Amino acid sequence: MRCNDLAKALFEQLKINIGRPEAKSKALAVKPAGSGQVSQNLTMASSSQLPGLPDGAADPCVHCGFCLPTCASYRVLASEMDSPRGRIHALRAIEAGELELDATVASHFDTCLGCYACVSACPSGVRYDQLIEATRPKLIEAGQRNPWQVAFRQLLLQVLPYPGRLRALLQPLRAYAGTPLQNLARCSGLTRLFGPEIEAMEQLLPPLVPESFSDRLPTINPARSSRRGRVALLLGCVQRCFDPAVSTATVKVLQANGFEVVIPPDQGCCGAVSHHQGEMELTRQLAANLVRCMNSIEGDLDAVLVAASGCGHTMKAYGELLAGQQQFLAPVLDVQEFLAEWGFSEEFRKQLRPLPAAVAMHDACHMIHGQGIQAQPRQLLRAIPGISLKEAIEAGVCCGSAGIYNLVQPEEAAELGRIKADDLSSTGATLVASANIGCTLQLRRHLGDRAHVHHPMELLAASAGLHQLPGLAKGIGAAEIAGEGENRQPVETAS
């Protein structure tokens, strides 16, 4: 699809949205929770409509309810049918031919964020992640979404995985994003005229910098000290447009630790956005293209690195997605996972200057639940002298980003964003560490000026004097250090 066609399509969807009746939204106030029974307005059927679901994935479920406190959709909707337990009950009823997959039933599956917090919480080992991933394609086949939902999702899938298209649509917004004009549009209520989905897109739009519109990192980025290894780096589609500083900081940290970083200029999307939506044909196509791209790099690689947890989660699933027919020649690792395993070089440790700031840790769902990565980011950041890491009370609860969830389910996502922002803000931290671009945009929207949100690689690069970090007080990083190794701390100096 050409860029002008995309712009026309977006304009047409805006007209449709402005002219349509106000969409009936789900109330965010607490509703009486169900008892686990199928609600009375759900249509009964005579035969199964969801063939191909994973055998036995739901069998261990004993309806204990341990998943409910961790479930983000249940948190804001308080409806049994919008919980893992309720959805499993519905799946069993559909498979037994007792329930029809109609629009009402489909809507309860659409409220699932796919955060997998329930998988971590389940004491019986129910693989809800497998169930919801297998169900999403069935929802598309069933055709139970309204025309606006279908068109809007397809528009997002035609734009977000393609940086060139996304940049073309962002070009006219360069004079708007991050300017007083944007503040005026928001304060006047103008953005609400376009409907909740488009308003959510506008609310997430960050200031656009020149680096948002072109990839400026070289293909080969040599190690800055004695070479320890060689890695490839995925730039990410949304991240390279909306937060390009993350990739720059990541490359600098890797170089300073003795790694040559290869960035294939023709790399495409990893397929994470389409994967989360159940668009499996597009996902497999994008995955196969990326595998070919990374495997075409001359010379051996120690790893294919990712700096966005949503991308990493999908790339680690390529073996299953591509049925083992194509696979990376090097292991896929999150950059924090990689550095925690290899360790910082002695030269890099000596470079680290104090960052005497309180930093709240945000665990992206596809990091903590999807990949089991939680200790590594903390391990790396604790190497920074003077840093104080703060933990959120509800670290495992989703922030509401969840791929494109905050665009297609904007009201529920906004409520979750407010809950997460309040939780992080209550730590007293002035900085938040977030390793996923979707989470970062969501948190920046809801935290406002209460805290600045940055990738852990940016914090490390700033401490090493390799990166300018907005949001840090003037002079941080310039103090004297006393002590050795992990005992290095900032000390007062005479002014």
Residue ranges and their predicted role:
Residues 54-74, 102, 106-126, 366, ...:
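Cysteine-centered iron-sulfur cluster-binding motifs in ferredoxin-type domains/subunits
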Residues 38-50, 74-107, 125-154, 450-459:
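Non-heme iron-sulfur electron-transfer modules
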Residues 13, 37-40, 489:
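Low-complexity, intrinsically disordered or signal/transmembrane-proximal segments
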Residues 11-13, 25, 33:
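Compositionally biased, low-complexity intrinsically disordered regions
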Residues 5, 16-18, 23, 39:
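Short terminal hydrophobic/aromatic SLiMs and anchors at protein ends
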Residues 45-58, 98-109, 255-258, 384-389:
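Short, intrinsically disordered, charge-biased short linear motifs at domain edges
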Residues 1-12:
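Extreme N-terminal basic, low-complexity initiation segments
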